[in-house]
């Protein structure tokens, strides 16, 4: 590395410095530095079926996005190595990556490939994105398309405003037959009935945009679209426990750093 071409070396070090820039913040460094009795081994974490929560805001994650992405990528690579040693090359039980707002927090470089290949190794990936436009901005046009195409189940919510994407979704959902009956009266009182058929969108773009809160459209493999009623978390049977956990976590986040 020291003897490498100066231009190549500078380019590599620039990437390294950007990836590790978050560690210049003492708060970030303290958060990722384990104590004497706090080791973290990715393989042990996965084999013991651990659960890890990475919480951040869009503004707060900006400086540490590369560090968070590197951490998640390390877990994914460890999961792949574990899967390769198991029968059928699949993790059992599988690993769930619930990536809510991943486009804002830490866009994973490997997400397109993970969506395409992860399911075969027992890695279930569930990215939650604000829009297809956001995916194109965070990855690229081609990679955003790969993420969309590789999604086995797609849940579409209302509120989108990109006319191109809304029209594409309407086309993907499909069309239905619309029947129109007409009556024609002749000069001599004759009467004729006629029925015509035309193809119309099942859900026009404006209907998709105005889907009410709590309603989504599910596209599952090659099945017809499913209008889905989504259950809000306060209506779940474990809502009381979730409220208690949220209160406890918020108190922990407000606690002053030592």
Where does each model-flagged region fall?
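Sensor-1/coupling segment of RecA-like P-loop NTPase cores
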Residues: 118-138
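Short beta->alpha connector loops at strand-helix junctions that form conserved
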Residues: 99, 129-130, 158-159
């Amino acid at each position: 590395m020291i003897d490498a071409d100066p231009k190549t070396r500078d380019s590599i070090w620039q990437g390294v410095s950007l990836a590790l820039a978050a560690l210049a913040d003492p708060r970030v460094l303290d958060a990722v530095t384990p104590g004497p009795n706090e080791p973290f081994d990715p393989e042990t974490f996965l084999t013991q079926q651990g659960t890890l929560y990475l919480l951040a805001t869009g503004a707060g994650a900006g400086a540490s996005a590369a560090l968070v992405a590197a951490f998640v990528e390390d877990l994914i690579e460890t999961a792949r190595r574990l899967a390769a040693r198991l029968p059928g090359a699949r993790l059992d039980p599988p690993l769930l990556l619930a990536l809510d707002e991943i486009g804002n927090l830490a866009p994973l470089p490997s997400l397109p490939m993970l969506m395409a290949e992860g399911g075969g190794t027992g890695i279930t990936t569930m990215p939650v994105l604000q829009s297809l436009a956001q995916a194109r901005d965070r990855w690229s046009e081609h990679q955003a398309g790969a993420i969309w195409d590789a999604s086995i189940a797609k849940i579409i919510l209302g509120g989108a405003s990109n006319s191109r994407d809304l029209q594409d979704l309407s086309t993907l959902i499909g069309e239905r037959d619309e029947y129109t009956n007409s009556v024609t009266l002749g000069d001599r009182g004759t009467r004729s009935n006629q029925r015509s058929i035309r193809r119309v969108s099942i859900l026009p773009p404006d209907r998709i945009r105005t889907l009410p809160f709590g309603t989504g459209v599910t596209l599952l493999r090659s099945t017809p679209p499913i209008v889905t009623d989504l259950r809000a978390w306060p209506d779940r049977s474990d809502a009381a426990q979730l409220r208690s956990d949220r209160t406890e976590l918020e108190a922990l986040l407000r606690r002053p750093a030592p």
